[in-house]
Design a protein with these regions (language model features):
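N-terminal leader/capping segments at the start of a protein or of a new domain
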Residues: 82-85, 207, 259-262
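Membrane-proximal basic amphipathic "stem/tether" segments
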Residues: 217-262
């Protein structure tokens, strides 16, 4: 059972310091409530009740959390090993609002390490994301910025990060260590949800970054036009040979030009 593995992963941590362990269950009837009850004495807070989706449940957890940083695992996700919390704690010194490490992506019996970049950018978030299983976020940031958007089903954590980092310049830091084993059977990894994800991402980009979006569209249009021109020229042998000859002349003279100006 996915939830049981996740609970055991958290309870097996050998950190010398106490940390809150909050479980939000959506009123499931598959035995999860009974499972949680067996660990109730080691869980800081738990509730089993119907919710309005992943981000509604996540926001419930944020609102009851009292620690300086919050971290989220879905049912089926695992902390990388028993020392993960112990190793990560020294980094959480409140210098940065967001700390993130690396993940193991697991699909059935296949595990693939995923190393996130040291530097994040708007262009990174256009096509990628930092999974919440890799992120430790300062609890107060949700009060300062906003809680997860419950209208979205999949990309609210992406929306929070791109807004916090690219719009508000919240300090962040990459920690080069494996944080968790991410179960890729979740909703965000389902290829059938890609269209809904892209639609919600576009809503966020239009809301917070309308000028950036227009610039990127213009750049893409220019790139496409140049490619089309290149392919058009290549169709006509005389023009193509002339262009190749010009490129060869440029390549021949460029090293000499660099040397003369050295």
């Amino acid at each position: 059972m996915g939830l049981e593995q996740t609970i055991n992963s958290v309870l097996s941590q050998n950190s010398p310091n106490d940390f809150e362990f909050i479980i939000i269950d959506g009123g499931s009837t598959d035995g999860n409530k009974e499972l949680i009850e067996t660990h109730a004495d080691r869980v800081t807070y738990w509730v089993s009740e119907p919710d309005n989706g992943i981000y509604n449940a996540t926001n419930k957890a944020i609102r009851v959390a009292k620690g300086d940083y919050v971290y989220f695992l879905n049912s089926g996700d695992l902390l990388y090993d028993q020392t993960t919390i112990q190793k990560i704690e020294p980094y959480l010194d409140q210098t940065c609002g967001i700390y993130y490490g690396n993940l193991i992506y697991q699909e059935k019996d296949i595990q693939v390490p995923w190393i996130f970049p040291e530097q994040l950018s708007f262009s990174f978030f256009l096509t990628e994301n930092i999974n919440h299983q890799a992120c430790f976020i300062k609890r107060s940031l949700f009060d300062e910025l906003f809680f997860y958007n419950e209208e979205y089903k999949i990309v609210s954590d992406w929306e929070f990060l791109i807004y916090a980092i690219c719009k508000r310049n919240i300090p962040y830091k990459h920690i080069d260590m494996l944080i968790a084993i991410y179960d890729t059977t979740g909703i965000s990894s389902n290829a059938n949800n890609r269209e809904a994800m892209n639609q919600d991402k576009n809503k966020t980009l239009q809301k917070y970054f309308p000028l950036f979006v227009q610039d990127y569209r213009n750049i893409d249009a220019i790139k496409l036009k140049r490619v089309q021109q290149f392919l058009f020229i290549k169709k006509f042998k005389p023009a193509w040979l002339a262009l190749k000859g010009f490129m060869n002349i440029v390549l021949l003279f460029l090293p000499k030009f660099k040397k003369e100006n050295a």
